[in-house]
């Protein structure tokens, strides 16, 4: 009987800890992107786009890293809305592309995305306390030209003329 109680207690502990591990590893793409006037910065280069990305999380440092990943995700799959005199930026690919090339994008968003993005206001981020944690906003600059080139070279993004053949 004692062995049975010990076994049941051990199994409950195992299930509880397994759920905690799985929850920590899952990171969803919960973010907002807004296009803002650049002010004094030079943003006339068509190869780059500068915008604000807001992500949600529990720790500020972790959420900052998530902001960078979400910014690249936003450019690739959602695009940017127009704001003021700045026009909208269309997404590089459709939202179904992520599920079609799931393995590629899971690997890409582990670290490869970092070479296409930089913070324009390092250390100067917006942090808002919310009911479920923190909302962290960072102004970022994404190199769209290099990102498109990488996706084309890897066979993920197709040229219009390739699609017509």
Language model features by range: what are they?
Residues 1-24:
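Bacterial Sec-dependent N-terminal signal peptides
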Residues 18-165:
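Domain-level marker for long, solvent-exposed, non-transmembrane regions
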């Amino acid at each position: 009987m004692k062995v049975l109680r010990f076994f049941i207690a051990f199994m409950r502990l195992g299930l509880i800890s397994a759920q905690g591990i799985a929850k920590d590893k899952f990171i969803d793409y919960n973010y907002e992107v807004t296009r803002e006037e650049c002010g004094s910065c030079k943003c006339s280069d068509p190869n780059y786009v500068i915008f604000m990305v807001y992500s949600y999380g529990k720790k500020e440092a972790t959420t900052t890293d998530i902001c960078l990943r979400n910014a690249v995700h936003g450019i690739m799959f959602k695009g940017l809305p127009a704001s003021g005199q700045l026009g909208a930026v269309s997404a590089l690919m459709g939202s179904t592309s992520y599920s079609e090339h799931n393995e590629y994008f899971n690997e890409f968003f582990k670290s490869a995305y970092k070479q296409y993005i930089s913070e324009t206001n390092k250390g100067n981020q917006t942090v808002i306390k919310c009911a479920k944690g923190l909302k962290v906003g960072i102004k970022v600059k994404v190199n769209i030209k290099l990102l498109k080139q990488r996706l084309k070279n890897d066979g993920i993004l197709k040229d219009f003329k390739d699609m017509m053949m």
